[in-house]
């Protein structure tokens, strides 16, 4: 009888040891849930945000649901100068950013931009990106000085940039910008671009005078806005262009007042990178201005407007509706 009890006790001790070992092993990673931040995860595991970022090679505070993070152990991201020679591609999903993709593949967003000839942070769901390999020398081929006399157009496809299109047609991205009256590098799939010919003198519309020397405040908070909401998206887009905003402006209908208190310029003139803000609805709405068109309309990116939270969408706001918004610069 005593032997049986002793055997059971030994067996129980062994089972508990195995259980604790599995629990310890399981606790080395954490799957991000909706609403979590690096701060809340690091606090839960008793480590610092810096340590958590180091363990996962994160260059920003951006994380996304279902992302698997290391929460203990040593960092494998100490040396990243060599990204390997094998080529690999990734299909962009809603909510992705260059930083989050780079983190997943153990590289940097700059390397991905170089691999794909990107000259802005804008990516689209369904877009194919190279995430490893070497930057091919022909992606930086020299441009021909002859832009041709006949007019020609090109339809933008996923992954295109002004530089890659210019290289294909033997011209420069500056010439394409002049031909199409572009004042920034933003282009989108399906857009028609002139790629040869002469720029007409009326290509550039007269814009209202704005201060060239305005410099908005910059915050470096973590994103505490609810995941997938319009406020969450705009916070991330501003951070991506180096113009971080406060994480304490609360609902969108309070953003204009809160931004003004923090020293931001608020007016009715949209500019690329500004925040379109509206008090309409119970919580209001904010969107990120991606492009200001020559006809006065604007293209914005947003979440939780015409789709579910977390789904990135684009919308053109007609010129006659632009006056319904305030713009935070």
From Swiss-Prot:
PROSITE patterns: CHAP, LYSM. InterPro entries: CHAP_dom, LysM_dom, LysM_dom_sf, Papain-like_cys_pep_sf. Its main location: secreted. It is an enzyme of class 3 (hydrolase). GO terms for cellular component: cell surface; extracellular region. Residues 1-26 form the signal peptide. It catalyses: Hydrolyzes the link between N-acetylmuramoyl residues and L-amino acid residues in certain cell-wall glycopeptides. The keyword Transferase does not apply. GO terms for biological process: cell wall organization; defense response to bacterium; division septum assembly; killing of cells of another organism. Gene3D superfamilies: endopeptidase domain like (from Nostoc punctiforme), LysM domain. Its EC number is 3.5.1.28. Transmembrane segments: none annotated. PANTHER family: LYSM DOMAIN-CONTAINING GPI-ANCHORED PROTEIN 2 (PTHR33734), MEMBRANE-BOUND LYTIC MUREIN TRANSGLYCOSYLASE D (PTHR33734:SF22). Peptidoglycan hydrolase involved in the splitting of the septum during cell division. This is N-acetylmuramoyl-L-alanine amidase sle1. It comes from Staphylococcus haemolyticus (strain JCSC1435). The lineage of its organism: Bacteria, Bacillati, Bacillota, Bacilli, Bacillales. The gene is sle1.
């Amino acid at each position: 009888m005593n032997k049986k009890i002793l055997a059971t006790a030994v067996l129980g001790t062994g089972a508990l040891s195995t259980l604790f070992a599995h629990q310890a092993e399981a606790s080395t990673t954490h799957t991000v849930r909706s609403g979590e931040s690096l701060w809340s995860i690091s606090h839960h595991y008793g480590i610092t945000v810096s340590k958590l970022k180091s363990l996962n090679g994160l260059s920003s505070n951006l994380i996304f649901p279902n992302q698997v993070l290391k929460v203990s152990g040593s960092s494998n991201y100490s040396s990243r100068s060599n990204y390997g020679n094998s080529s690999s591609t990734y299909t962009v999903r809603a909510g992705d950013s260059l930083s989050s993709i780079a983190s997943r593949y153990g590289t940097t967003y700059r390397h991905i931009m170089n691999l794909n000839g990107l000259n802005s942070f804008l990516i689209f769901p369904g877009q194919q990106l190279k995430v490893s390999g070497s930057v091919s020398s022909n992606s930086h081929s020299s441009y021909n000085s002859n832009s041709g006399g006949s007019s020609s157009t090109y339809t933008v496809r996923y992954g295109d940039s002004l530089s890659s299109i210019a290289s294909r047609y033997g011209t420069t991205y500056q010439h394409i910008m002049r031909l199409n009256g572009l004042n920034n590098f933003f282009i989108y799939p399906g857009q028609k671009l002139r790629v040869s010919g002469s720029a007409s003198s009326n290509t550039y519309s007269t814009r209202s005078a704005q201060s060239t020397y305005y410099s908005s405040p910059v915050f470096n908070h973590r994103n505490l806005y609810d995941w997938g909401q319009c406020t969450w998206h705009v916070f991330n887009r501003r951070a991506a262009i180096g113009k971080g905003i406060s994480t304490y402006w609360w609902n969108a209908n309070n953003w204009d007042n809160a931004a003004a208190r923090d020293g931001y310029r608020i007016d009715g003139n949209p500019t690329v990178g500004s925040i379109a803000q509206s008090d309409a609805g119970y919580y209001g709405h904010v969107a990120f201005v991606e492009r200001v068109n020559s006809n006065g309309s604007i293209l914005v990116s947003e979440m939780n407007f015409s789709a579910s939270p977390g789904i990135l969408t684009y919308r053109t706001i007609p010129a006659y509706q632009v006056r319904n918004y305030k713009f935070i610069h």
